Amino acid sequence: MAVPKRRVSKTRAAKRRSHYKIALAKPIKDKDGSWKMPHHINKFTGSYK
């Protein structure tokens, strides 16, 4: 089992974790031409995409 040779500082750990981001969902164009967020129901047409 691997064991750390020396302690990782808070700053170094934070710099490494700065890339662990969730990408924001981009709106998509619906069949009727309106923009909406993915995986949401359109109130007017009732479509789910």
From Swiss-Prot:
InterPro entries named among the record's database cross-references: Ribosomal_bL32, Ribosomal_bL32_bact, Ribosomal_zn-bd
One record GO biological process: translation
UniProt keyword terms in alphabetical order: Ribonucleoprotein, Ribosomal protein
This protein's record includes keyword Ribosomal protein: yes
GO molecular function annotations of the record: structural constituent of ribosome
CC per GO annotation: large ribosomal subunit
Cytoplasm is among the record's keywords: no
A Pfam family matched in the record: Ribosomal_L32p
Source taxon at top rank: Bacteria
PANTHER family in the record: 50S RIBOSOMAL PROTEIN L32, LARGE RIBOSOMAL SUBUNIT PROTEIN BL32
NCBIfam families referenced in this protein's UniProt entry, alphabetically: rpmF_bact
Family affiliation: Belongs to the bacterial ribosomal protein bL32 family.
Protein name (record): Large ribosomal subunit protein bL32
Organism listed in the record: Helicobacter hepaticus (strain ATCC 51449 / 3B1)
Biological classification of the source: Bacteria, Pseudomonadati, Campylobacterota, Epsilonproteobacteria, Campylobacterales
UniProt gene name: rpmF
